[in-house]
């Protein structure tokens, strides 16, 4: 009896060892090309990760009113905006490469462009429908072009990687070089034109898709690009600046011909709490009362003794403001 029991025990042990040898463990805490981008939800999640680059990982967002954001770097040196705490060198446009607040946008968005480029290629190979592929690839191309324009406005042509092969299969001798102004502008212009002409993206998004780029977003950035280059050619006495301004005028007419967007009837309504999702806004980064997703604009602009209409004191840092000359120009 003991011998029979031992034989059964040995057989069971061998069976268990044999089964374990054929097991292939499924790892749920690791993302690989084999287990991700296999369905529509994966694609949406990955694209959301690219949109997250607009914000970063802190309350001091890259496109908010934070010091060193795209918004402040583009507006504070102009005569449209002033700041109570900016270094004079910033407001006078005397920037240095050693200044972190000047350089951080470059450090944020050059890698973000690489991220978008790689995802475009991966979505092309994903086992999802063509409609899903076309929509999200179109969005990523417009997002990438938007970032490339803003970087161009701040730093000139930057060494952005737009060839996915250089990212997914890099060689040891690959180096990123700064493109010529013409090459850079042509790429951004073509990406935006395709985002408009392909008609894949809608004129505007609503509902849960509000905050995604659209045809009108591509038009908006293209208009900025043409105005930028028209001003550059006029100031540098190079090229045909009038040609750029004519192109800008046409894009502006195209936006109006969409018959969707319009300016607020009253200038003061721009600041109204009731103006959310109004049709003056072409592209928005929605804010929510949760960490990282908030909007600290009010705190930046309100005076320190400000109280709401209900008499409640609100946080005010007395920082950014618009000169009275600008405000009065809207009367």
Residue ranges, per PLM feature:
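Bacterial Sec-dependent N-terminal signal peptides
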Residues: 1-29
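Solvent-exposed loop/turn segments at secondary-structure junctions
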Residues: 158, 166-168, 288-290
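Short helix/strand-bridging catalytic loops that position acidic/His residues to coordinate divalent metals
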Residues: 169-176, 207, 236-240
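Conserved, well-structured interaction surfaces
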Residues: 44-48, 52-58, 81-155, 174-186, ...
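Short, flexible active-site-proximal loops enriched in glycine and acidic residues
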Residues: 155-161
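Short linear capping/connector segments at secondary-structure termini
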Residues: 29-32, 97, 163-171
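Secondary-structure transition into beta-strands, especially the periplasmic turns and strand N-termini
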Residues: 4-9, 125-141, 246-254
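An aromatic- and glycine-enriched ligand-binding surface/loop that stacks and positions planar moieties
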Residues: 20-83, 162, 185, 193-200, ...
């Amino acid at each position: 009896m003991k011998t029979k029991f031992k034989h059964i025990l040995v057989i069971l042990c061998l069976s268990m060892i044999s089964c374990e040898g054929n097991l292939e463990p499924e790892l749920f805490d690791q993302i690989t090309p084999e287990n991700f981008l296999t369905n529509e939800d994966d694609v949406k999640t990955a694209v959301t990760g690219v949109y997250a680059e607009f914000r970063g990982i802190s309350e001091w967002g890259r496109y908010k009113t934070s010091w060193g954001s795209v918004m402040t770097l583009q507006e504070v040196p102009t005569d449209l905006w002033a700041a109570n705490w900016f270094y004079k060198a910033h407001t006078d446009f005397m920037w240095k490469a050693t200044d972190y607040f000047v350089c951080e946008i470059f450090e944020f968005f050059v890698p973000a462009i690489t991220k978008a480029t790689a995802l475009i290629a991966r979505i092309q190979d994903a086992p999802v429908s063509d409609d899903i592929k076309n929509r999200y690839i179109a969005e990523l191309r417009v997002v990438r072009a938007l970032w490339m324009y803003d970087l161009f406005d701040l730093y000139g042509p930057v060494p952005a990687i737009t060839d996915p092969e250089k990212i997914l299969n890099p060689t040891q001798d690959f180096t990123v070089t700064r493109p010529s102004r013409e090459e850079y502008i042509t790429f951004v212009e073509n990406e935006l034109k395709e985002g408009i002409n392909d008609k894949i993206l809608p004129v505007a998004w609503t509902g849960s898709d509000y905050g995604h780029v659209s045809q009108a977003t591509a038009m908006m950035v293209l208009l900025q690009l043409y105005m930028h280059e028209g001003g550059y050619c006029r100031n540098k006495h190079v090229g045909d600046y009038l040609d750029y301004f004519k192109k800008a005028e046409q894009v502006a007419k195209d936006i109006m011909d969409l018959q969707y967007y319009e300016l607020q009837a009253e200038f003061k309504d721009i600041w109204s709490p009731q103006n959310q999702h109004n049709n003056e806004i072409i592209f928005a980064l929605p804010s929510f009362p949760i960490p990282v997703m908030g909007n600290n604009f009010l705190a930046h602009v309100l005076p320190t003794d400000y109280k709401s209409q209900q008499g409640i004191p609100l946080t005010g840092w007395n920082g950014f403001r618009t000169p009275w000359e600008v405000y009065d120009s809207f009367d």
